[in-house]
Amino acid sequence: MAIVSSTTSIIPMSNQVNNNEKGIEDNDHRGGQESHVQNEDEADDHDHDMVMPGFRFHPTEEELIEFYLRRKVEGKRFNVELITFLDLYRYDPWELPAMAAIGEKEWYFYVPRDRKYRNGDRPNRVTTSGYWKATGADRMIRSETSRPIGLKKTLVFYSGKAPKGTRTSWIMNEYRLPHHETEKYQKAEISLCRVYKRPGVEDHPSVPRSLSTRHHNHNSSTSSRLALRQQQHHSSSSNHSDNNLNNNNNINNLEKLSTEYSGDGSTTTTTTNSNSDVTIALANQNIYRPMPYDTSNNTLIVSTRNHQDDDETAIVDDLQRLVNYQISDGGNINHQYFQIAQQFHHTQQQNANANALQLVAAATTATTLMPQTQAALAMNMIPAGTIPNNALWDMWNPIVPDGNRDHYTNIPFK
């Protein structure tokens, strides 16, 4: 009985142990499923990765030409597309990093060869903001066995328009197959380009393609500023033309001044410009005054000539002040003012010389009038009061003109 009871008691215990083990397995299975689902959720962030984390793309030049470029030209497929097919000459170099499939400091692209001219071999390397310029000749790339496998061309990006662009720090290496191999595959010519930036120089920040419209906005703002400058230049040109018109009017007035001047009398000139009215009245100048000839005739001639020179100098000084005023007021007076002033001064000198010759001729003529001179001396020797005034004027009538008689009424004869 005891044995049986012990046996029966052992059976339920063994069943309990089995059930416990089964429950532990179920919990482990359930926990495994939950952890697997959790791991799948965490792995969703990398489902679209083209390469594994930590992978770096640093191919050699031989690998770029023999594997990537040749397979692309031959039309073969790649398990992983690491190089983007892009016409990079349609974009500026600082826009390219956002379009590359991979790369941190250098970026790779398959580029179709676009010719600048339809019937020529020269490629078109002009972008939106500048152009790529080749430096040096092409270099042959050889394999480990020294077999030529391709060509390499180095280009530098210049911002602006050729040939006055500004050199930047963006550099590109263009790899292509030999020309005879391209014809062999009867494919469009394709090159493989590696773009990178020289370190230590900051030309333009690398921006995504969505922000590339800033360049167009900058061009529009630049165009508007250029149009504004042209408008201001046009207005300043019109103002300058108005000033030139005023200057021409002033020159005409000065010419009138020089033509209206006469030797006998006065000249009154009124010159008007855009700022103020300047009126200069030149006093009446008696260029020639006939004087009675006496023993001091030479002294009278010299004094008259000196007085005449002083008057002419005053006229020239007034004209020079007028010209100087016009120069200071106009700002850009033509040098013809000075030419007119010089002509006027030259004319005055000629008139002065002519008047001096007339005075000398008059003096020479007066020396021949000895009878009249003797009569004048004899009359001066007559005592005062013996000859009436009327008779005295009758004696002087041949010498003194009628027009200047009033000028000599105040001369005492005692």
From Swiss-Prot:
User: Which phenotype arises from disrupting this gene?
Assistant: Early flowering phenotype under long-day conditions. Hypersensitivity to cold.
Bias-annotated ranges (Low complexity): 233-251
Tissues with expression: Expressed in aerial organs in early stages of seedling development.
Residues annotated as region Disordered? 1-47, 200-251
Domain named NAC is located at: 51-198
* Compartments (UniProt record): Nucleus
Could you tell me where the Basic and acidic residues compositional bias lies?
A: 22-47
Pfam families noted in UniProt: NAM
Q: Which InterPro entries match?
A: NAC-dom, NAC_dom_sf
Extract the PROSITE patterns matched here. NAC
Q: What are the UniProt keywords, alphabetically?
A: DNA-binding, Flowering, Nucleus, Repressor, Stress response, Transcription, Transcription regulation
Q: What induces it?
A: Circadian regulation with a peak of expression at dawn under continuous light conditions. Circadian regulation with a peak of expression around dusk and lowest expression around dawn under continuous light conditions (at protein level).
GO BP terms, alphabetized: flower development
- A molecular function GO annotation: DNA-binding transcription factor activity
An additional note in the Swiss-Prot or TrEMBL entry is:
The gain-of-function mutant lov1-1D (T-DNA tagging) shows a late-flowering phenotype under long-day conditions, and freezing tolerance.
Mind telling me which PANTHER family this protein's record contains?
NAC DOMAIN-CONTAINING PROTEIN (PTHR31744:SF79), PROTEIN CUP-SHAPED COTYLEDON 2-RELATED (PTHR31744)
Q: What is known of its domains?
A: The NAC domain includes a DNA binding domain and a dimerization domain.
Protein name in UniProt: NAC domain-containing protein 35
